[in-house]
Amino acid sequence: MKIGVYPGSFDPVTNGHLDIIERASKIFDKLIVAVLVNPNKTPVFDIDERVELLKETTEHLPNVEVKAFKGLLIDFMKQENAKVIVKGLRAVSDFEYEFQMALLNKKLEPSIETIFMMTNSKYSYLSSSMVKEVARFGGCIEDLVPEKIAKKVMKKLNKKYAEMEENK
């Protein structure tokens, strides 16, 4: 069985993420969307919320599983018996970072491969950070995140930013 892992923080999941997930799910027998706990980031959505949003978003894809993980991706890959990391690229700047990570992962575990998938051009500008920025200033995010979860995402972001304003 060919198992791929698409890791990320997904805070929140965007239409760009979903595009990569849908396309990668056609390549692998099983695709695991691995939601990482990143100690270098302070997420708006906690790990359970991100996992749940991704499960809702991908429920139409029978070979996709969503799991949270901490620690090294390589250790998670071994635990899941996966051999391929899937990374989405929007721009050259993404490639530079992801290329370094791919080389590091290869150094840590030579049997692991990384494949890069170019984002659909209509999502090349899109990031979770941009979704949060648009929401923060009252913009519409419905075309930026999967329709199925747009209202939940907006509600959470509105609540978060209202709390931030109160604490100023």
Curated annotation (Swiss-Prot):
One Gene Ontology term of the molecular function aspect: pantetheine-phosphate adenylyltransferase activity
HAMAP family (alphabetical): PPAT_bact (MF_00151)
Protein role: Reversibly transfers an adenylyl group from ATP to 4'-phosphopantetheine, yielding dephospho-CoA (dPCoA) and pyrophosphate.
Record InterPro entries: Cyt_trans-like, PPAT, Rossmann-like_a/b/a_fold
NCBIfam families found in the cross-reference section: coaD_prev_kdtB (TIGR01510), cyt_tran_rel (TIGR00125)
Protein's recorded name: Phosphopantetheine adenylyltransferase
Binding site for ATP: 9-10, 17, 88-90, 98, 123-129
Species whose genome carries this gene: Caldicellulosiruptor saccharolyticus (strain ATCC 43494 / DSM 8903 / Tp8T 6331)
Gene (name only): coaD
Catalytically driven reaction(s): (R)-4'-phosphopantetheine + ATP + H(+) = 3'-dephospho-CoA + diphosphate
Pathway(s) the chain acts in: Cofactor biosynthesis; coenzyme A biosynthesis; CoA from (R)-pantothenate: step 4/5
Subunit structure: Homohexamer.
Residues at the site labelled Transition state stabilizer: 17
Domain of life the protein comes from: Bacteria
Binding positions for substrate per the UniProt entry: 9, 41, 73, 87
Pfam family, one: CTP_transf_like
Alphabetized PANTHER family for the sequence: PHOSPHOPANTETHEINE ADENYLYLTRANSFERASE (PTHR21342:SF1)
